[in-house]
Amino acid sequence: MKHNFDNHTFLASCEHDADKNVMHITFTNGKTYSYGDCSHDDFEAFKNAKSAGKHYAQIKASKGQYQP
């Protein structure tokens, strides 16, 4: 499942891999980072957050970058 952030300063999109419970977040500079232990509920909360930037900071702090 994928979500595009329209007109966001630094977030371009996020995608959730339900099989691996991983969220891939792509930035406007083209780089993609992956975060593990992210449920579908985490994905929904991120895409519907009032402030996607603040929510991203929470994901980054609590999940850590995923290393496949």
Residue positions per predicted region:
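Acidic/histidine-enriched, beta-strand-rich ligand/metal-binding domains
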Residues: 1-68
